[in-house]
Amino acid sequence: MTIEREQLEMDVLLVGAGPANLSCALHLTNLVATYNERATRSGAKPLDEINVAVIEKAAEIGSHQLSGAVLDPVTMRELLPDFEKHGQAPLEAPVGDEKVYFLTARGKFAMPIIPPSLRNHGNYVVSLNKLVRWMGEKCEAAGVNIFPEFPGAEMLYEGDRVIGVRTGDKGIDKTGKAKPNFEPGVDILAKVTVLGEGVRGSLAKQLVERLKLDAGTDPQVYSVGIKELWEMPDNRFPAGSVIHTLGFPLDSHTFGGSWVYGMRDRVIDIGLAVGLDYRDPRIDPHHEYQKFKTHPLISDLLKGGKLIRYGAKAMPVGGWYTMPQMTADGVMIIGDSAGMLNGERLKGIHIAIKAGMLAAETILDALVANDYTRARLRAFDEKFKASAVGRELYKGRNFHQAFDR
């Protein structure tokens, strides 16, 4: 049976409402407005109204983002220069006290010098879901269309050129058959589609496999990050405090480490990252996390506290050599979907924001030229690699590989 589907035409479609895509959408609307103002003043032809849409599978923007992160603000200052002023952005606290420990089963050794990659002076502890929600509000105020509960199901092609995305059908039973409340997904057509759907995004996997965008790259390597939010009875771990640890509960052959971040209202974010390339098949990352909480450093910290949220997510930690070709005809890949995470620094938000801005600049050029081919969009690959965040990833290109030796 052929299903009739509604078609929605956009100029730019962004799949996933994370930091990369939201920064892209916001920066693009600002760039288009600036371009049209200059064109009007100079007598040139301005662009027609540009329709930008963000689709997100979650019920609310930010609800699939796990709280707790340390933000390097350098790229956010480029996107929104005043974000630190007047309490505009939902920042938990500037990083204050920092410690790095090597843990044994019952003891700890403080590192006398914090490794440069883990120094966070000048950075901010943030709640990522609050930050993303705030960025979404900025986008909507700028005229971006944001559609929550619209998961992307499959790419739409003309030959090998991407022309949009089909959203998921609703009202399907467990066997795949339509129920009485069946609603077919929508075909959203766009001149440029930007995939920023997070690590191992389903559409990015389809695209990379079909167009062989990972040819000549190393296979991506993943870690799983397990974290909890605890509400404490007192201010024993002030907002802005940061701890990172190595060692227990992981053995010397397993890639990973832990963190504790102090947030507002006596909440702490505590987590453990475990490389999924572990050698011992008996390792269970969730069990390792429970062991981690039995260490005296952590158990004493959590005493009397209340668990208020739990979550886990995969992280792409393979680095520079695992990143795919990020553009093809009509499409771009950014953020975690493209492996834009610095595993050495445990940071990716600032990289995602800059990638979104560079993608927006490339899309503006494509809109002006009315050219959405790989030949035009590949400028993004080049801009990203030449940028400060690209150089940062290149500098740490062998970090994970060093653990395999």
What are these regions (language model features)?
Residues 30, 46-48, 129, 133-134, ...:
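Predominantly flavin-linked oxidoreductase catalytic cores and closely associated redox partners
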Residues 125, 337-350:
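Glycine-rich phosphate/pyrophosphate-binding beta-alpha loops
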Residues 45-50, 339-345, 357, 361-404:
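Active-site-proximal substrate-binding core of FAD-dependent oxidoreductases
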Residues 27-31, 38, 45-106:
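N-terminal FAD cofactor-binding segment of flavoenzymes
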Residues 4-20, 53:
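Beta1/beta-strand and adjacent pyrophosphate-binding region of the FAD-binding site
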Residues 312-343:
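FAD-binding beta-loop-beta segment adjacent to the flavin cofactor pocket
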Residues 1-9, 37, 175-185, 336:
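A short, basic/flexible loop-to-alpha-helix module at the beginning of a structural domain
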Residues 20, 60, 200:
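Conserved Rossmann-like nucleotide-cofactor binding loop
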